[in-house]
Curated annotation (Swiss-Prot):
Segments crossing the lipid bilayer: 21-47, 60-88, 110-134, 147-171, 179-197, 230-251, 277-298, 333-352, 396-414, 418-432
Presence of keyword Protein transport: yes
Main function: The central subunit of the protein translocation channel SecYEG. Consists of two halves formed by TMs 1-5 and 6-10. These two domains form a lateral gate at the front which open onto the bilayer between TMs 2 and 7, and are clamped together by SecE at the back. The channel is closed by both a pore ring composed of hydrophobic SecY resides and a short helix (helix 2A) on the extracellular side of the membrane which forms a plug. The plug probably moves laterally to allow the channel to open. The ring and the pore may move independently.
Intramembrane feature spans: 60-67, 68-79, 80-88
Family to which this protein belongs: Belongs to the SecY/SEC61-alpha family.
Keyword annotations of the record: Cell membrane, Membrane, Protein transport, Translocation, Transmembrane, Transmembrane helix, Transport
Extracellular face of the membrane: 48-59, 135-146, 198-229, 299-332, 415-417
Lineage: Archaea, Thermoproteota, Thermoprotei, Desulfurococcales, Desulfurococcaceae
Location of the protein in the cell: Cell membrane
Protein name: Protein translocase subunit SecY
Organism this protein belongs to: Aeropyrum pernix (strain ATCC 700893 / DSM 11879 / JCM 9820 / NBRC 100138 / K1)
Coiled coil: none
Length: 457
């Protein structure tokens, strides 16, 4: 029995959300999705009991977007545990370290159960690390005791547990999509709306763009200091969204023919953004984790220690700048940010293609198994692999570079919701549009539903 089997066996002992006996209607699934979204926003506004009020907030935008989290609340850990668990298992499966066929229902069942156990383990670990590491008591005269640690850790763990079950509700078919995608989209949308209309009472009444225009309509709105939303960021946001929608619609088509039905020809469309948002997402997760560790080290080592200062300097240069003013004020940071994110995005892009089974060899094997071949060439995996290699690796490099460049430019010019957030949000909206369109088609034409073997509650 392997590790995945042990984790799956443990996971099956936990309470689970039952799958609907028959597929719910689209409106019912939308209603469930709306309920989950409302619960997410409620949890994002319930502060943790037992921590100093002044230590609620202060979260870096990148962390808030990547993990759909809200500092000092029940959503402090956000989707971090479940995303980390999922990525680890997918990487191990893709690297063939763990043998698991995700195309097989039994393999998917094991994956889901193992992911739940691993996510709960990460939730418990992060909850303890946040509290014992002094995350909520840094800079205060309060000396927390064991009861304080236990109380806050329990709240963090319960918040993460609810997120895991929210995702299970969605994944089992009660809602549409996944809770992970839904929460990321909600967080990005909230950030964009806040940048346009937000105010911070007693600190910055004119924080958002609209309040700033009303209070002080002059040329300073083109570029504001301290990372405040400005007109440059607003127009950058619009341009980034339009460009992302266009790029995600682009395809590179490879001509194919059917071996079973001679004379039938078609094309296999490869997304121009072949690696989608995965490389830049992995870069964002890496930098977010480094920022998280920085906060924990501040308590253990002290902000004056040499080791902490070296570490915080590295994290500072890897973190995205907050708008045009900061980018110009610190050109060295901007240059390091551009170089590091570009290189890491390309490296992660190639890694993901190999790990996720998107490389030429595995794609060729899939086409051969499907009875497909390229016109004028032998139906040989090695021949097909050589042809696909001319498409896939250049697409991997180019798409990783383009995605990184778009996110970097968006961050430098202060796009609302961050460049990474906009990239994720546009991709998620595209997925939701496709899912809802499909569901509406199935409800409009019941015959399609019967062909697919689906029933309505």
């Amino acid at each position: 029995m392997g590790v995945i089997d042990v984790l799956a066996a443990v996971g099956e002992r936990f309470p689970a959300v039952r799958k609907p006996e028959r597929k719910p209607t689209l409106y019912r699934r939308l209603a469930w999705t709306g309920v989950i979204l409302v619960l997410y926003f409620i949890m994002s506004n319930i502060p943790l009991y037992g921590i100093p009020p002044q230590n609620i907030g202060g979260q870096v935008d990148l962390q808030r977007i990547i993990f759909a989290s809200s500092a000092g609340t029940l959503m402090e850990l956000g989707i971090g545990p479940i995303v980390t668990a999922s990525l680890i298992i997918q990487v191990l499966v893709g690297a063939k370290i763990i043998k698991l066929d995700l195309a097989d229902p039994e393999g998917r069942r094991k994956f889901t159960s193992a992911q739940k156990v691993l996510a709960l383990a990460f939730a418990a670990l992060e909850a303890v690390a946040f509290t014992v590491g002094g995350r909520y008591w840094v800079g205060t005269a309060i000396e927390p005791g064991p009861l304080d640690y236990a109380l806050v850790s329990l709240q963090l763990f319960l918040g993460a547990l609810l997120v895991i079950y929210f995702d299970e509700v969605m994944q089992k078919g009660w809602g549409i999509g996944s809770a992970i995608s839904l929460f990321i989209l909600a967080g990005v949308a909230q950030g964009v709306v806040w940048s346009i209309f937000g105010t911070i009472p007693g600190v910055a009444q004119d924080y958002g763009l609209v309040p700033a225009i009303i209070s002080n309509p002059d040329l300073t709105l083109l570029a504001r200091p301290n990372g405040f939303p400005d007109l440059t960021g607003f127009f950058t946001t619009l341009a980034a969204i339009i460009l992302l929608v266009y790029l995600q619609a682009m395809r590179v088509e490879i001509p194919i023919t059917s071996e079973r039905f001679k004379g039938i020809r078609s094309r296999v469309p490869l997304q121009f953004i072949y690696v989608t948002n995965i490389p830049i997402l992995l870069v964002g997760i890496l930098v977010s984790d480094l920022l998280l560790v920085q906060r924990l080290l501040a308590d253990y080592l002290g902000v004056e220690s040499r080791a902490y200062q070296i570490y915080s300097s590295i994290v500072y240069y890897l973190s995205p700048p907050r708008g045009v003013v900061q980018s110009i004020a610190d050109p060295v940071k901007t240059a390091v940010f551009i170089a590091s994110w570009t290189v890491l995005s390309i490296v992660f892009g190639y890694m993901w293609v190999e790990i996720a089974g998107l490389n030429p060899r595995e794609q060729a094997e899939r086409l051969i198994k499907g009875g497909l071949a390229i016109p004028g060439m032998r139906s040989d995996p090695r021949v097909l692999e050589r042809v696909l290699r001319r498409y896939i690796y250049p697409l991997t490099f180019l798409s990783s570079l383009i995605v990184a460049a778009l996110v970097i430019v968006a961050d430098i010019f202060g796009a609302y919701g961050t460049g990474t957030g906009l990239l994720l949000a546009v991709g998620i909206i595209n997925q939701y549009y496709a899912m809802i369109t499909r569901e509406r088609a199935l409800e409009t034409y019941p015959l399609l539903r019967r062909i697919l073997g689906e029933e309505v509650v």
